[in-house]
Amino acid sequence: MVPTSKRLVGLAVLLGGLFGCATAGTRGQVGGASEGLADPPPRAGDPLVLIAMPPSATFQDVRRSLITEIQRDFNVSTLTVTSSTGMDEIGAAIARLSPSCIVLMNNTTVSLYREYQHAHPDTAKFPPSVVVMASFIDELRPTLINATGIAYEVPGVTAFVDLRSVIKAPVRKVGVVYRPSFRQFIARQKELAEKEQIELVAVEVGKGVYADRLRSSLHALLVEQKVDALWMLNDNELIKSSEYLDQTWRAELRNANVPLVVGVPNLVNPRTPLGSFAVVPDHEALGLQTANLIFELAENGWHAENHAVELPISIKTLADVKQLRAKFGLKDDALQHIDRALE
């Protein structure tokens, strides 16, 4: 049994293309991890947490703080996941290591574990999984057995209110495009936005979002609905590629004087302007929160399915200050509300 005090670690202090073939790693480690992903030396008899993740820097930030908090109570093994990683590699790691819990970072890793579960329907018990750094976990969770996690999406209203505190232009009406599978998510976001006197105007598109359909939907929001801002969901079908972004979002925003709120930091870049403002989880804090969740699951028999998906407890704001200042005006205290100002 993990001490209760461990569950609270870090909480008092605390209150957005992400994907090697398996190669030999350090002791207790699986997958093609670099030296920077070396796992702590294993101890006999301790339960093990398997971390399946892409090797990129943002994921390493989460992993680093997670391991710092759990390594005294758990052995840790890291499986690096890339575009060439297959379901069998996940299965081999589980068979060899018998993990007490699996941390799944990003949607590709979740898909691999789901494939593994579906390919072994007669398995009596799958290791519980904690999903982090993945889009729309509430929608993913029903497709997994014994899973919970921490949402990556910060509620839209949080971003809208933060944007409103930064720019002089009004933020009363925000437009969003979504696919049918996100209907319930959008309904929840509308309710939250109303509490802050912000109207969320939503346009539903088909399951497969063709560029012309997305562009016409964005045009309707900008020209007909005259929204004050646009919100881009963390949905791969709405982003797809740089070329797709050029044909859709950039094409419609080129002549529109509205900010674009995004949910991943790499879309806010003054050198290739697109996203104006982002509110994202603090990755170090996300690792600590993941550790806390693992301790809670350990104390409660690893019943992940009984634990609700959590919201991130610490967030950061990023802004293309050059764009915001030129197009929408910055309030006098704007920089006090921005954690990372880009120009």
Predicted feature locations:
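Hydrophobic alpha-helical segments within soluble ligand-binding/sensing domains
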Residues: G36-L37, S135-P142, T148-R172, P281-W302
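Short, well-structured alpha-helical segments in soluble
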Residues: G86-C101, Y116-P121, R215-A229
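Hinge/cleft segment of the Venus flytrap/periplasmic-binding protein
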Residues: E296-E343
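Venus flytrap/periplasmic-binding-protein-like
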Residues: K125-L140, L245-P273
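Periplasmic-binding protein-like
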Residues: S98-N107, P128-V130, G175-V177, Q225-S241, ...
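Extracytoplasmic "Venus flytrap"
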Residues: G32-L37, P41-S65, T78-T85
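An alpha-beta-alpha
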Residues: I51, L66, G149-E196, H303-Q323
